[in-house]
């Protein structure tokens, strides 16, 4: 049976008003298909305006759209394919393949608007998730089934860190990943896709993109498309990694849509529904008794201001934060993770163990002391410090460099072979540095090394 028929009566950019009979108005969030010859566009109902008009947001560019075109209510929200068939493929917001590898055989579809799991279905067992990245595993460990935020300004390495995590998860854990590109550069998405094909991790990953050049409707909904695909695997008992790059663009697209729909903006020009929209997405990203979704979300921080409403609203939902610092990047230390700003809820002796907790606390203490001494060093120089403070500075500089690490995904740029460091090795390395075992080794030996054994090898070569 064909759906309810309507006609396009107004087009203002991505906002389309469609007139239906007053007794057959489509429900909110229903998908509407506008067709004329070869032209086809999908829009989502956002508002009912008056008795017989619905206001919709287009999911693709509206060039070629005219008043008077026929529109059909599909009777359901946008639905996307789920299941094993989506692995290794690249999709748009509507779940259509965009990798030119042919259609997929759709066995099952889920609507992108779904309720979050109920309390009784949720799992609350805290467990550490090993990433193989030293600075993360030691100082701000990730929780299996947790939500992690990657905070940083433009160009400090958020996307590279995400790519390394995808690589490590696929190769070391054999886990499935869903990568959602929300409002980021198409070039980066293209590079990621080809790198994943070359490295062979693509078979364990589904990619969903709604990039910078797409209308706000697509950028606002593409995160839900990726999440829906991840939910299917979780409900089938698997551990999934959901990457969202960038969650700020989700908020930004929501802000554009809100303004287009005529809502009064709230603080800093953001949408009044900012917290509600963020909650609707984040509450669905959770672990159940069946399986888990661990999500890593890159968070662009406008003008490096962490108090901006977009990053501040995101903070409330996170279990761990990895803060990338421009100051550390300027020192040439990568990943440029700020060891003192990054936090984790599970850095707790009952979860990570007594030894790990103590080593992490001592590393932070030494780095904190070094930070306090930097003003004195800048004015008077290192020679004016007491012997104890000199030892702290020397050790802190070695720790700072040992927190760097060569990445597999950066091999073609750095010429250094990427290293995956198990958490036991990470703890042992930092413990021995704190004990003063390597005070005589040159600082440069600690930079871009994997384990502490690599440092010793490097020091021998440096002679």
UniProtKB/Swiss-Prot annotation:
A GO term from the CC aspect: proton-transporting ATP synthase complex
- Subcellular location field: Cell membrane
For membrane topology, the record states: Peripheral membrane protein
GO molecular function term, any single one: proton-transporting ATP synthase activity, rotational mechanism
- What does the UniProt keyword field contain? ATP synthesis, ATP-binding, Cell membrane, CF(1), Hydrogen ion transport, Ion transport, Membrane, Nucleotide-binding, Translocase, Transport
Q: Which InterPro entries match?
A: AAA+_ATPase, ATP-synt_VA_C, ATP_synth_F1_bsu, ATPase_a/bsu_AS, ATPase_alpha/beta_chains, ATPase_F1/V1/A1_a/bsu_N, ATPase_F1/V1/A1_a/bsu_N_sf, ATPase_F1/V1/A1_a/bsu_nucl-bd
Instruction: Extract the Gene3D superfamilies matched here.
Output: 2.40.10.170, Bovine Mitochondrial F1-atpase, Atp Synthase Beta Chain, Chain D, domain 3, P-loop containing nucleotide triphosphate hydrolases
SMART domains, per the entry:
AAA
Which EC class is the enzyme in?
translocase
Query: Where does the chain bind ATP?
Result: 152-159
> Can the keyword Transport be found in this entry's annotation?
yes
EC number(s) of the enzyme? 7.1.2.2
Question: What SUPFAM superfamilies has UniProt attached to this entry?
Answer: C-terminal domain of alpha and beta subunits of F1 ATP synthase (SSF47917), N-terminal domain of alpha and beta subunits of F1 ATP synthase (SSF50615), P-loop containing nucleoside triphosphate hydrolases (SSF52540)
Q: Which reaction does it catalyse?
A: ATP + H2O + 4 H(+)(in) = ADP + phosphate + 5 H(+)(out)
Family, per the entry? Belongs to the ATPase alpha/beta chains family.
**Subunit note:** F-type ATPases have 2 components, CF(1) - the catalytic core - and CF(0) - the membrane proton channel. CF(1) has five subunits: alpha(3), beta(3), gamma(1), delta(1), epsilon(1). CF(0) has three main subunits: a(1), b(2) and c(9-12). The alpha and beta chains form an alternating ring which encloses part of the gamma chain. CF(1) is attached to CF(0) by a central stalk formed by the gamma and epsilon chains, while a peripheral stalk is formed by the delta and b chains.
Q: Name the job this protein performs.
A: Produces ATP from ADP in the presence of a proton gradient across the membrane. The catalytic sites are hosted primarily by the beta subunits.
**HAMAP family reported for this sequence:** ATP_synth_beta_bact
Name-wise, this protein is ATP synthase subunit beta
Q: Which organism is it from?
A: Clostridium beijerinckii (strain ATCC 51743 / NCIMB 8052) (Clostridium acetobutylicum)
């Amino acid at each position: 049976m064909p759906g309810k028929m309507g006609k396009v009566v107004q087009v203002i950019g991505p906002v389309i008003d469609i007139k239906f009979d007053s007794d057959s108005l489509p429900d909110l969030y229903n998908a509407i298909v506008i067709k004329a010859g070869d032209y086809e566009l999908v829009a989502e109902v956002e508002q009912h305006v008056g008795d017989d008009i619905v206001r919709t947001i287009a999911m693709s560019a509206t060039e070629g759209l005219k008043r008077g075109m026929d529109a059909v209510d599909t009777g359901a929200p946008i639905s996307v394919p789920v299941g094993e068939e989506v692995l290794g493929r690249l999709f748009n917001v509507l779940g259509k393949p965009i990798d030119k590898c042919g259609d997929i055989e759709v066995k099952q579809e889920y609507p992108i608007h779904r309720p979050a799991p109920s309390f009784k279905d949720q799992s609350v067992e805290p467990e550490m998730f090993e990433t193989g990245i030293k600075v993360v595993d030691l100082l701000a460990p990730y929780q299996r089934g947790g939500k992690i935020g990657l905070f940083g300004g433009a160009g400090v390495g958020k996307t590279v860190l995400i790519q390394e995590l995808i690589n490590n998860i696929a190769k070391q854990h054999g886990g499935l990943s869903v990568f959602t590109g929300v409002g980021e550069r198409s070039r980066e998405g293209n590079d990621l896709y080809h790198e994943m094909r070359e490295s062979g991790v693509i078979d364990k990953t589904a990619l969903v993109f709604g990039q910078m050049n797409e209308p706000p409707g697509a950028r606002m909904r593409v995160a839900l498309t990726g999440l829906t695909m991840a939910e299917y695997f979780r409900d089938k008992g698997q551990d999934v990694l959901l990457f969202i790059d960038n969650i700020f663009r989700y908020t930004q697209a929501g802000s554009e849509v809100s303004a287009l729909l005529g809502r009064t903006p709230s603080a800093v020009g953001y949408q009044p529904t900012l917290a509600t929209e963020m909650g609707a997405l984040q509450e669905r990203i959770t672990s159940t008794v069946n399986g888990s979704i661990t999500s890593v979300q890159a968070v662009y921080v406008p003008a490096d201001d962490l108090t901006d409403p977009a990053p501040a609203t995101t903070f409330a939902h996170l279990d761990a934060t990895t803060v990338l610092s421009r100051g550390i990047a300027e020192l040439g230390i990568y990943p440029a993770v700020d060891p003192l700003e990054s936090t984790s809820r599970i850095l707790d002796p009952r979860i990570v163990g007594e030894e790990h907790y103590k080593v992490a606390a001592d590393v932070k203490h030494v780095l904190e002391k070094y930070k306090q001494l930097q003003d004195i060093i800048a004015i008077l120089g290192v020679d004016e410090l007491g012997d104890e403070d000199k030892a702290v500075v020397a050790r802190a500089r070695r720790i700072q460099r040992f927190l760097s690490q060569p990445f597999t995904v950066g091999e073609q740029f750095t010429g250094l072979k990427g290293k995956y460091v198990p958490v036991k090795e990470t703890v042992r390395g930092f413990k021995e540095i704190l004990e003063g075992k390597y005070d005589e080794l040159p600082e440069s030996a600690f930079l871009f090394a994997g384990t502490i054994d690599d440092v010793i090898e490097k020091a021998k070569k440096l002679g």
